Amino acid sequence: MGAATSALNRRQLDKFEHIRLRPTGKKKYQIKHLIWAGKEMERFGLHERLLESEEGCKKIIEVLYPLEPTGSEGLKSLFNLVCVLFCVHKDKEVKDTEEAVAIVRQCCHLVEKERNAERNTTETSSGQKKNDKGVTVPPGGSQNFPAQQQGNAWIHVPLSPRTLNAWVKAVEEKKFGAEIVPMFQALSEGCTPYDINQMLNVLGDHQGALQIVKEIINEEAAQWDIAHPPPAGPLPAGQLRDPRGSDIAGTTSTVQEQLEWIYTANPRVDVGAIYRRWIILGLQKCVKMYNPVSVLDIRQGPKEAFKDYVDRFYKAIRAEQASGEVKQWMTESLLIQNANPDCKVILKGLGMHPTLEEMLTACQGVGGPSYKAKVMAEMMQNMQSQNMMQQGGQRGRPRPPVKCYNCGKFGHMQRQCPEPRKMRCLKCGKPGHLAKDCRGQVNFFRVWTVDGGKTEKFSRRYSWSGTECASSTERHHPIRPSKEAPAAICRERETTEGAKEESTGNESGLDRGIFFELPLWRRPIKTVYIEGVPIKALLDTGADDTIIKENDLQLSGPWRPKIIGGIGGGLNVKEYNDREVKIEDKILRGTILLGATPINIIGRNLLAPAVPRLVMGQLSEKIPVTPVKLKEGARGPCVRQWPLSKEKIEALQEICSQLEQEGKISRVGGENAYNTPIFCIKKKDKSQWRMLVDFRELNKATQDFFEVQLGIPHPAGLRKMRQITVLDVGDAYYSIPLDPNFRKYTAFTIPTVNNQGPGIRYQFNCLPQGWKGSPTIFQNTAASILEEIKRNLPALTIVQYMDDLWVGSQENEHTHDKLVEQLRTKLQAWGLETPEKKMQKEPPYEWMGYKLWPHKWELSRIQLEEKDEWTVNDIQKLVGKLNWAAQLYPGLKTRICKLITGGKKNLLELVAWTPEAEAEYAENAEILKTEQEGTYYKPGIPIRAAVQKLEGGQWSYQFKQEGQVLKVGKYTKQKNTHTNELRTLAGLVQKICKEALVIWGILPVLELPIEREVWEQWWADYWQVSWIPEWDFVSTPPLLKLWYTLTKEPIPKEDVYYVGACNRNSKEGKAGYISQYGKQRVETLENTTNQQAKLTAIKMALEDSGPNVNIVTDSQYAMGILTAQPTQSDSPLVEQIIALMIQKQQIYLQWVPAHKGIGGNEEIDKLVSKGIRRVLFLEKIEEAQEKHERYHNNWKNLADTYGLPQIVAKEIVAMCPKCQIKGEPVHGQVDASPGTWQMDCTHLEKKVVIVAVHVASGFIEAEVIPRETGKETAKFLLKILSRWPITQLHTDNGPNFTSQEVAAICWWGKIEHTTGIPYNPQSQGSIESMNKQLKEIIGKIRDDCQYTEAAVLMACILHNFKRKGGIGGQTSAERLINIITTQLEIQHLQTKIQKILNFRVYYREGRDPVWKGPAQLIWKGEGAVVLKDGSDLKVVPRRKAKIIKDYEPKQRVGNEGDVEGTRGSDN
């Protein structure tokens, strides 16, 4: 064990572990605290073995004791721990940390007294401090001295590596925090400039901070040179020169010169101390840069402990660049002033200037449960004492009767009042208004002249542009924006054209307006001129007088002393009367006070004569601004304004004038080069106009946004609430400010009639209607505001979509209304108003197209139109209504578009209805006449989804809970020519589950109209590589069995029909069959295709065969259709084949390659065709790959069509991630490359079973593991890696799969590991399905084995080796081995082909004796070779070709040694 852990013996360790960390706490010291302390020793250049003895602990305390009052939390914790160890070594009995610290403080004071006594004794005896070795300590008295005197010479002692290491570690850990300055002071005590530069040089990674320090050094050095000019003339011999600024910085002086200036010069110049002061100034600037929080911003939180607040306060005050007096003033005033109300009451009771220890002791536990209990006990005690005083002879003042503030009756208080809460003013008690609008309140929310002139009522509206808002009592003009803007600042300003606006208030006879504008999101500081001297001062309306720092201003003339009251007490100032002050363009005369103020202040004595206005309102800066920019390389819109009628121009002028007053838009001039056209339309009531802006060009140039809300909330997903309220955020977009840097792009122009003058140009200050970024920015901003409100109002459930709010709660009506009012107040504080006229308090609530009640919900009334003539547009609207109604009305059909005749038409063209469409329309109208209602979601109760099949390939489903309908939906089959209803059913299941996850976040229990045996029979052979949940099987007639049965093996003793067909380019063809027993039939077809002829041949074989039949075909097209077992098809020929196959008992359908000399197939080919087609495969590989990427045909089709070897065709399919999968899935395909595996853990009989599946083949590896940990998972993965090649592993994101052990195995085995979301159909589809199949197999064989482990392994054997099906009709093991061997054959074939391509051929053609070439060898056969000369492929007899290797450099033709024909008879 290390030194820190062995600092105490067993007895001392027992005593140490019984000491509590805090007096009232339960936690005690542990050995981990010793280990931590040992690691912290190195920061202070101390060895950790000092913790092992009493003397060592005392040395540590001597180092830490001076730093403890201003140290960090870690330093204080270390000091406390060392104090406890000191007491343990000293055998002092202590119970907690405070007792140990008290004992150590006493000891430290004793040590300090002894040291002072020894120092005094030594000085009186010898006059100089000496150590035992005769080395004199420098005059500074510090123990960290870098110089020692030996005899009459001073010798420099460099800084120790431990000191430099401590300095570097402090900077690295604190990052120029406030602790760096005292740390530097402590480590550089008594250092020379050389040593200080050495400390700076070791900070190599902080060049930015060092540059700041360097600039401060240069400035101070220049000031030193100015204040200390060099003496004129040469220096006398032997005299030491005076140090210059660069000498103090150590750049032009030696170490010996620095020592002489410090210790022997006359007068002595302590260059080290001067240089330290310069460095400290630079470090303070760095601290301010790295800690931008001002001490003025440090305020105690409502639940923050006073001790934490004090720590933050002192950390910030150490970072302030101010003198000690100012910091002392800040500490005395701000520490109490910025405390929370609870602590402030206690601190004010301590009297003037309490010590920090008294404040910490008094505020200990404030805000906690014990403190609250104590306050409640004191209050109850006071109440009881008052009651006893009244009972004892009616002594004391009698209590007045209790009166309710809400209803005015006596006998109860407001919180006990049963009547509804009334809006009443807290100031005057009158109903009808709140305190913020009270006229009896002095100058509240009014435009206030400082000199006390008459004021006007203030209109609480937003104004970002600086214009004055209209009065709240003004007459509403009929032409104006439809909604009010929320509250904000309103103030006057000068327009961009330079014209001064009229003021609406009385200004004491001075027609000046407001002389300047300053936003209040920062301190209003302005440069003023006092007697011609520029002074930066704070404009403070709360200060009576103007007071300036003495260092900033020197005034001459008579003055008189004065004492003024401040936050920290009285201040002695000098009063100068009748002094000239210039603020902006106003020249005033008044009284100036000069004194020790922390900041210059302009008070009301000078502000009042200037007649300014103070406008108080809600600041729009509270709402965060979302930055927006244009796309890369795009520019803003520059579209000319089109002509408008006079009526529209006047309407736009009225609207924009109102918008400008409310601050939503502001005027711009011609310097803005962008423009967007505007126009206006009449509203629905035809009495008002609405302004519209054509932002199409700006939307094209604006950056892309992502809709943060991907859909509208559905009422079926809402929980049932006792109370509901629906709110609407009024003028939603106009409540959110637009990025100031983007506003210029929204500029628009209102033209004038007949171009009688220039148009008036504006730009938006808030989110405009019609701009692409407005919805996203509003959604994101409103969501962040509501997130904080939801935390403060947990009793409310708030659902937001854009500006519509659904608010529900389980409270009673009175409490609910109170909570909603709190919500509206909080939204109002952010500038989001909820107008009363759009607030819905009584059901039914209109919300998002629904009608809501507390116990149910309905769709708004849907009425189908009755028209004589219908256009395409009318039909589209009708289908949209039916789709919307289908979420609650079951049985609706939307096949009207397909049933209407006429083909594709324009939107306004008339369409003709078919009888089927009219019948469907009438049926839908009847369904909509009945009232349907949905219920709300009840958590904890399972949801069931019932599926019903409709006519025309449509499906309907209902979500129910306890028999009540939550929601209804419908599903239509995908657009496929040949479909299987079971496959459609699987797609429907996935749609239902996805919809349930979106709305409720859980999966429903499915009720499907199919028998279990029927489904499992189909699913066993045609399972999807996707996830299918559990469901209940409901037997209904439609899907009992609607498809035919295909057997896996030939039917014995039954005739075999070989079908074939041929088609010519003239659209004429033949189709027929020949049977094993000699039957044959051939028919001539007209106007057909080869595919149709193949299907016709199969139909003929089915017509002429018995109940059991074997059919062999060479058509991949026909084979692909029929093996999918479709139940319906758009092709009449396929429908006839399906009907014939359903009548059969057993059908064996097999494919063989065409034109390969296979018996039966060759005979039928001769009957229907002449000649065969041969294609060389090597030139067709790229074409085959392109065709496969487009149509995804299988490898057999590729090999047959393009004449490719099987291994080449299989490789093309294997390279496609969409095709190398099991079955024929429609959705949810996963990557099934040859090396891809999926792994998951499942549970069986309370044991963990880990399963891995090879995706491409379905091969399973599984075993029982003791625990679901990363170690066991890694061991299982290593077993599989030792047996099979793995290149990619896909799992879910469980902790065992994301562990370090699994990551290490994947790294070692070069396995790409990906994770996905559990139950996602596109993630773990294969493994989820295999888990289900494995459990089904185990259930069938569980009785045959004793142990679960044996059952799992036996199930793997049965699945891998005993079941055939899927791709190629093989077992999983055969398929996996086939995939691996195919990979090896491909590699071998590629090597062989590459070798062949390395040969060159010289050849002769016909009777031409000239040898041609060289050509590229493509293929070498027994009697001929295939070569490529240029772009031509040629077949040349073997005897007319000479093959040579392509050596470099090329060989000559006459070199017979390289000619293949000269090497022997084998060639």
Swiss-Prot record:
Cofactor(s) this protein requires: Mg(2+)
Annotated TM spans: none
Chain intervals for the UniProt region annotation (RT 'primer grip'): 845-853
One Pfam match: rve
Zinc finger (Integrase-type): 1179-1220
Sites where the protein binds Zn(2+): H1188, H1192, C1216, C1219
Post-translational modification: Specific enzymatic cleavages by the viral protease yield mature proteins. The protease is released by autocatalytic cleavage. The polyprotein is cleaved during and after budding, this process is termed maturation. Proteolytic cleavage of p66 RT removes the RNase H domain to yield the p51 RT subunit. Capsid protein p24 is phosphorylated.
Residues where Mg(2+) 3 binds: D1240, D1292
Cofactor binding notes: Binds 2 magnesium ions for reverse transcriptase polymerase activity.
Positions with a binding annotation for Mg(2+) 1: D728, D803, D804
DNA-binding region: 1399-1446
Span of the annotated motif Nuclear export signal: 16-22
Catalyzed reactions: Specific for a P1 residue that is hydrophobic, and P1' variable, but often Pro; Endohydrolysis of RNA in RNA/DNA hybrids. Three different cleavage modes: 1. sequence-specific internal cleavage of RNA. Human immunodeficiency virus type 1 and Moloney murine leukemia virus enzymes prefer to cleave the RNA strand one nucleotide away from the RNA-DNA junction. 2. RNA 5'-end directed cleavage 13-19 nucleotides from the RNA end. 3. DNA 3'-end directed cleavage 15-20 nucleotides away from the primer terminus; 3'-end directed exonucleolytic cleavage of viral RNA-DNA hybrid; DNA(n) + a 2'-deoxyribonucleoside 5'-triphosphate = DNA(n+1) + diphosphate
One cellular component (GO) term of this entry: host cell nucleus
Active site as annotated: D540 (for protease activity)
Domain of life: Viruses
GO BP: any one term: viral translational frameshifting
Motif position, Nuclear localization signal: 26-32
RNase H type-1 domain: residues covered: 1050-1173
Residue ranges of domain Reverse transcriptase in the record: 662-852
One MF annotation (Gene Ontology) recorded for this entry: RNA stem-loop binding
Domain Peptidase A2: from-to ranges: 535-606
Residues annotated for Mg(2+) 2 binding in this entry: D1114, D1165
Entry note about domains: The p66 RT is structured in five subdomains: finger, palm, thumb, connection and RNase H. Within the palm subdomain, the 'primer grip' region is thought to be involved in the positioning of the primer terminus for accommodating the incoming nucleotide. The RNase H domain stabilizes the association of RT with primer-template.
Protein name (record): Gag-Pol polyprotein
